[in-house]
């Protein structure tokens, strides 16, 4: 693959220092709200303070857009465009994980230091939310009429705990027959050092995330009996334990690794920015895939990109009120993350065969499937072009997200789902996500606003 010529970082699209200072002051107010979601709701005052900031910081948006709310605080602003035939969704979440005493600053008091803005949510994901809102605020004030497109800005209040915010929102969209041409959520970023041997920064745009499937595995005997009597070699707990052990032992042979298209593209499009011999290896995956796959399958983070992951998360059996009785029933919860459902269900047939041997039945109790987006399609190519325009110093590559986002909720109501925020992360910054000293480069905040303005105008 021909190596595109990258430019200097100084040629990025940016705002003036004065404008960027305004952005930092606004974002800091959002960071200072301790929007940590809890079931008991002890931070509701902080959430309310956060919600009151939105019309204060973005008055034109608040006056112009229609606001939808779902559940305990998930909100969606809707800007109706002129002659609109398309819908686009800019996503984020405003809940954050908590901080602790390992921070060098107060995690809920935005602090500027050494060219960075420290604070919980600066990366995950109050900066993207701020930039999305600010971009639309400015477009409205500039008289932009949003020709041909309705713009939705959605933000969940409980994404970090897999809450119901965006679940309720997508149920509403289904009911109203609203379908999105493209959804843009968190998940990818501008990174460096994440793939060994790459000589430049990369804008990694997730075109897919691994789906989630949960199964109840259960065994039941016709009769129990006292644990002191014979037959201890055949009870529900032992049967289930043998099933769990065998499935766990054979997982890698049941779900063999493969280079899925989006994973192959990640490495092939990075290859021009690698030196020998990595550029040769990853530029010719069809030739060297057996070698590369063998190496990657031995690295947990890498193997997650190539195969279905399986783990047993809960197990129970017998009657705790009468622990001397042999267990008549036992069950376990099996959790899987897959790249493609056909591979998942092919592997499940092998697991069911193991279950038959031990009298274990399986029932799917949750299916959370994600549909991959075509990285050769129009939506990805538009984002790719916007990134080359706004960040001409970075390579742009598709990738598979092995973590999770709220974007998966939109599988049934969106044609294209992309996971990317224009946060520029060094390797050290990347390590602060959900960890102490989360921070964003001060200059990067303005870059984010520029990107989202162009994204809205580009669609």
Listing of model-derived features with the role each one plays in the protein:
Residues 66-68, 83, 192, 198, ...:
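An extended, acidic, His-containing surface patch that forms the Zn2+-binding/catalytic region
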Residues 72, 105, 148, 179, ...:
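Short, solvent-exposed loop/turn segments at the edges of secondary structure
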Residues 117, 123-204:
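Acidic/histidine-rich catalytic neighborhood of metal-dependent amide-processing enzymes
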Residues 94-95, 247-252, 352-360:
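A common structural junction motif
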Residues 168, 226-254, 348:
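A short core secondary-structure module
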Residues 1-122, 142-149, 333:
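Acidic/His- and Gly-rich active-site-bordering loop/insert found
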Residues 171-182, 238, 245-262, 266:
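Structural signature of cysteine-dependent C-C bond-forming condensing enzymes
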């Amino acid at each position: 693959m021909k190596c595109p010529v990258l430019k200097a970082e100084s040629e990025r699209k940016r705002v003036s220092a004065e404008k960027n200072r305004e952005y930092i002051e606004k974002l800091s107010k959002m960071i200072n709200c301790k929007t940590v979601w809890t079931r008991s709701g002890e931070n509701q005052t902080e959430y309310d303070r956060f919600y009151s900031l939105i019309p204060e910081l973005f008055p034109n948006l608040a006056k112009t857009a229609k606001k939808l709310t779902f559940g305990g605080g998930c909100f969606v602003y809707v800007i109706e465009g002129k002659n609109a035939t398309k819908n686009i969704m800019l996503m984020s979440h405003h809940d954050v994980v908590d901080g602790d005493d390992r921070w060098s600053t107060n995690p809920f008091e935005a602090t500027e230091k050494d060219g960075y803005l420290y604070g919980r949510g600066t990366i995950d994901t109050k900066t993207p939310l701020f930039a999305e809102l600010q971009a639309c605020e400015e477009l409205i004030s500039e008289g932009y009429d949003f020709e041909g497109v309705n713009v939705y800005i959605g933000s969940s209040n409980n994404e970090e705990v897999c809450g119901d915010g965006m679940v309720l929102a997508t149920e509403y969209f289904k009911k109203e027959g609203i379908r999105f041409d493209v959804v843009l959520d968190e998940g990818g970023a501008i990174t460096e050092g994440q793939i060994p041997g790459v000589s430049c920064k990369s804008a990694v745009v997730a075109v897919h995330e691994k789906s989630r499937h949960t199964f109840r595995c259960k065994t039941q005997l016709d009769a129990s009996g006292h644990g002191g009597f014979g037959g201890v070699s055949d009870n529900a707990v032992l049967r289930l334990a043998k099933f769990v052990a065998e499935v766990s032992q054979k997982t890698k042979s049941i779900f063999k690794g493969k280079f899925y298209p989006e994973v192959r593209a990640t490495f092939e499009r990075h290859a021009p920015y690698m030196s020998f011999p990595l550029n040769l290896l990853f530029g010719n995956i069809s030739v060297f895939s057996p070698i590369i796959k063998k190496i990657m399958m031995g690295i947990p983070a890498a193997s997650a990109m190539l195969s279905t992951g399986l783990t047993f998360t809960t197990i129970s059996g017998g009657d705790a009120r009468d622990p001397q009785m042999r267990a008549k029933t036992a069950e376990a919860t099996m959790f899987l993350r897959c790249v493609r459902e056909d591979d998942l269900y092919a592997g499940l047939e092998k697991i069911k065969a193991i279950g038959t041997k031990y009298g274990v039945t399986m029932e799917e109790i949750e299916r959370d499937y994600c549909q991959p987006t075509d990285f050769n399609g129009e939506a990805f190519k538009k984002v790719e072009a916007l990134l080359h325009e706004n960040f001409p110093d970075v390579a742009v590559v598709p990738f598979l997200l092995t973590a999770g986002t709220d974007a998966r909720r939109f599988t049934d109501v969106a044609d294209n789902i992309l996971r990317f925020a224009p946060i520029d992360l060094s390797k050290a910054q990347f390590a602060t996500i959900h960890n102490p000293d989360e921070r964003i480069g001060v200059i990067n905040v303005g870059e984010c606003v520029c990107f989202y303005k162009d994204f809205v105008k580009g669609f």
